[in-house]
């Protein structure tokens, strides 16, 4: 295993988590904020050392082009910092979202992504209605369970037809608008909507 300083390990772990969560690497500024480095040049120095050690590859012409190379080397998160989050299959009307019959499996996530004092679940996305929000077909959204939402929140909602959908929420004068993030799709206009939760993150497997 390659010898890394704690700071280098923290940076590598953060890059991996961000790629898994969002599908693309963080910026130098985001890396600095995550590991407590105010100087971008210091972050660049650590990235250069990680590149020298063969753990990442960078494209100097693109600010976010950081490729993880140590695919066979796992960075382990201590078990006491992991939360097993239920992955919901079919959402059934009239039953709690995390009812046993709705759960397909459990997925381990770092506490930073799924705080243990909050009720969090995951849901697989089917379709391309939220692609402009960076949520793609077959992604898993990380959802904080709640029954209210603010305008502009991305939510999991149960429609009047008892169908669960992930859309951006807007409460307007005479109705509720569930807005897709895809210019080819029309909004869903409803009188009543049941909010199941607010999307707080995205998990993607890079093929």
Curated annotation (Swiss-Prot):
It is an enzyme of class 3 (hydrolase). The keyword DNA-binding applies. The record marks 93-94 as: Cleavage. Disulfide bonds: none annotated. Transmembrane segments: none annotated. GO terms for biological process: DNA repair; DNA replication; negative regulation of DNA-templated transcription; proteolysis; SOS response. It comes from the Bacteria. Represses a number of genes involved in the response to DNA damage (SOS response), including recA and lexA. In the presence of single-stranded DNA, RecA interacts with LexA causing an autocatalytic cleavage which disrupts the DNA-binding part of LexA, leading to derepression of the SOS regulon and eventually DNA repair. Homodimer. NCBIfam families: lexA. Belongs to the peptidase S24 family. This is LexA repressor.
């Amino acid at each position: 295993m390659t010898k890394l300083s704690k700071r280098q390990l923290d940076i590598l772990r953060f890059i991996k988590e961000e790629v898994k969560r969002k599908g693309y690497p963080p910026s130098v500024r985001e890396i600095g904020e995550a590991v407590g480095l105010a100087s971008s040049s210091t972050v660049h120095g650590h990235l250069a050392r990680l590149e020298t050690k063969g753990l990442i590859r960078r494209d100097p012409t693109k600010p976010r082009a950081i490729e993880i190379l140590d695919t066979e080397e796992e960075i382990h998160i201590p078990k006491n910092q992991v939360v097993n989050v239920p992955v919901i299959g079919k959402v059934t009307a009239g039953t709690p979202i995390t009812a046993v019959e709705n759960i397909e499996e459990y997925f381990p996530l770092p506490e930073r992504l799924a705080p243990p004092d909050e009720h969090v679940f995951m849901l697989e996305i089917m379709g391309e209605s939220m692609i402009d929000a960076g949520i793609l077909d077959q992604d898993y959204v990380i959802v904080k369970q709640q029954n209210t939402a603010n305008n502009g929140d991305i939510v999991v909602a149960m429609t009047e037809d008892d169908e669960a959908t992930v859309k951006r929420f807007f409460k307007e004068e005479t109705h509720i608008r569930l807005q897709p993030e895809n210019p080819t799709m029309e909004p869903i206009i409803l009188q009543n909507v049941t909010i199941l939760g607010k999307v707080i993150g995205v998990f993607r497997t890079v093929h």
